[in-house]
C-alpha cells in the first residue's frame, strides 16, 4: 500500500510531503474531556497536604492552538488560593501525566483557576 505524496521543487532541491490518510480527528471537546479525566486522576494521586482528598475538575478549556489549557477546579471546604498554589507547584508533574495519556503533538501549559458558579451557570431545566 503506497502513501500519497506531493513533491514540490524548491530551487534544486525536492521536498517531499507525505499526505496523512484521512482518519478520525479528535474534536476540541473530546480533547478537553479526555484531559479532564486524566487530570482528575493525576490530581487525586498528588501527595501534597494542601490538596484535599476530593478535588473536582469542573472544566478544561484549551486554546485553538492547544498551547494553553485553563483548568477550572473546585473542592469542598478547601482553601482555594492554597489549593491553586499547590496545583501550580505540581504543574510539571501534571503536564507529564497529561502527555503520557493524551496523544497530542504538544502538551499545553496548564493554568489553574477556581470554578465559580457565575462562570458555569446551571443548565436550563436543571433543578439545582
UniProtKB/Swiss-Prot annotation:
Compartments, record wording: Cytoplasm
Disulfide bonds: none
GO BP annotation list: maturation of SSU-rRNA; ribosome biogenesis
Molecular functions (GO terms): ribosomal small subunit binding
Keywords annotated in UniProt: Cytoplasm, Ribosome biogenesis
Pfam families found in the cross-reference section: RBFA
Annotated InterPro entries: KH_dom-like_a/b, RbfA, RbfA_dom_sf
Similarity annotation: Belongs to the RbfA family.
Subunit (UniProt): Monomer. Binds 30S ribosomal subunits, but not 50S ribosomal subunits or 70S ribosomes.
PANTHER family for the chain: RIBOSOME-BINDING FACTOR A, CHLOROPLASTIC-RELATED
Function in brief: One of several proteins that assist in the late maturation steps of the functional core of the 30S ribosomal subunit. Associates with free 30S ribosomal subunits (but not with 30S subunits that are part of 70S ribosomes or polysomes). Required for efficient processing of 16S rRNA. May interact with the 5'-terminal helix region of 16S rRNA.
Protein name: Ribosome-binding factor A
Native species: Deinococcus radiodurans (strain ATCC 13939 / DSM 20539 / JCM 16871 / CCUG 27074 / LMG 4051 / NBRC 15346 / NCIMB 9279 / VKM B-1422 / R1)
Amino acid at each position: 500500500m503506497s502513501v500519497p505524496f506531493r513533491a514540490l521543487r524548491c530551487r534544486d532541491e525536492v521536498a517531499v510531503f507525505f499526505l496523512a490518510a484521512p482518519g478520525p480527528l479528535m474534536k476540541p471537546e473530546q480533547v478537553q474531556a479526555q484531559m479532564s479525566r486524566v487530570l482528575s486522576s493525576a490530581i487525586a494521586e498528588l501527595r501534597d497536604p494542601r490538596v484535599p482528598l476530593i478535588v473536582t475538575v469542573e472544566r478544561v478549556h484549551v486554546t485553538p492552538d492547544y498551547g494553553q489549557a485553563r483548568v477550572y477546579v473546585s473542592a469542598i471546604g478547601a482553601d482555594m488560593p492554597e489549593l491553586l498554589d499547590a496545583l501550580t507547584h505540581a504543574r510539571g508533574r501534571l503536564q507529564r501525566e497529561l502527555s503520557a495519556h493524551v496523544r497530542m503533538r504538544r502538551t499545553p501549559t496548564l493554568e489553574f483557576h477556581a470554578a465559580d458558579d457565575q462562570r458555569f451557570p446551571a443548565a436550563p431545566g436543571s433543578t439545582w
